Amino acid sequence: MSSAHNTLESIKYRRGVLQLLDQRRLPLETVYCDITSIDDICCAIKEMRVRGAPAIAVSAALALAVVAERELKEQRQNSVWKTADDMRQFLLMSCDKMMSARPTAVNLSKVLIQLKKDIETDKANTMEAVLETCVQLAEKIYAADVSFNERIMRHGAAHLLKLASKERVNILTICNTGALATSRYGTALGIVRQLFYEGHLQHLYACETRPWNQGARLTVYECVQENIPCTLICDSAVSAVMKTHDIDAVVVGADRICKNGDTANKIGTYNLAVAAAYHKVPFFVAAPSTTLDPLTPDGEGVVIEEREATEITHIASGGGGLQSDKSNSDYGRKRVVADGPHLKVWNPVFDITPASLITGGIITEHGVFPPATAGPLFDISRIVEP
């Protein structure tokens, strides 16, 4: 990837220091949060200061390394930790605590389970050596996600151009799957970036993505920063835009891809896939292999996170249409929906797109995997590097 292309940094890391871009404040303010404790990272994940399945997982891994270094200094001074096993126990308990922060995105649990396994089996017999193991593991996860982004970008852009058989393509997407959702460039939006860098992007159409408006606040923000041609549309306009604007492909990200290809992603993705099937527009899912979940047979086994009703019934009084939950007191909230004893609000964060609607294929760092013409459409457990 050429260094000439500068992308936003949602994660700022150097050894011992981790800062996360508070994405609730974008695009009006650019504020980084210091992560100095496990409570800090859990809060950042739960409150969606950091979001996007890959970014959540990487942030958790880096937070573990940063907090471990700080804790080692403090515990040594207080003579609380006396052996390497004392430190290991702290790290394992921290992983368990972070794992519960967001249940639907599989990247977080996969990364933390692997970290726990590596920490448990590490033979280091000093606290300093345990720390070095933790730091090396976290930095390896960080670097791997950047590499995954780059490879997904290249594979996806090349495939879409070949499929469309034209010089410049129109892409439709939902939510935010760019640099703000990953370690560097993005997955679905990374593919759009690559098309733009190569001069092959005609236009991007971005769904606003209610109720947190990740498309309007974040995807459009990334596009404006890099002068990527983009049109923002209401979520309810997806069928109309496919009918009237010559969309060549729909490309979305994922928070979990089950063994059969069923995909959990931002609420509204299922609607998008249904509309794409009707209009015969190829529908692609772009995600790193860390998002693949071969242990969950299908979408029925995915726990769908639900969030507070106020995300739908209230807007931030600070302006800009920012959505905020009760913890986001920096902006204040104003109710814009009538209240009553019989009013209920259903606010699932994700929906499940059946594998049968992923008509284009699944794009990972290993390549593009179209649906099979016979047998199961997808078998995630067999998606391995060629």
From Swiss-Prot:
One term under GO cellular component: nucleus
Where in the cell does this protein reside? Answer: Cytoplasm; Nucleus
Q: Which reaction does it catalyse?
A: 5-(methylsulfanyl)-alpha-D-ribose 1-phosphate = 5-(methylsulfanyl)-D-ribulose 1-phosphate
Task: Give the positions the UniProt entry annotates as the active site.
Answer: D255
Entry protein name: Methylthioribose-1-phosphate isomerase
Q: Where is this site: Transition state stabilizer?
A: C175
Q: Name one GO molecular function term.
A: GTP binding
Function noted in UniProt: Catalyzes the interconversion of methylthioribose-1-phosphate (MTR-1-P) into methylthioribulose-1-phosphate (MTRu-1-P).
The UniProt entry, under SUPFAM superfamilies, shows: NagB/RpiA/CoA transferase-like
Which pathway, per its entry? Amino-acid biosynthesis; L-methionine biosynthesis via salvage pathway; L-methionine from S-methyl-5-thio-alpha-D-ribose 1-phosphate: step 1/6
What InterPro entries has UniProt attached to this entry? IF-2B-related, IF-M1Pi, IF_2B-like_C, Initiation_fac_2B_a/b/d, M1Pi_N, NagB/RpiA_transferase-like
Q: Which GO terms describe its biological process?
A: L-methionine salvage from methylthioadenosine; translational initiation
User: What's the Enzyme Commission number for this chain?
Assistant: 5.3.1.23
Family label: Belongs to the eIF-2B alpha/beta/delta subunits family. MtnA subfamily.
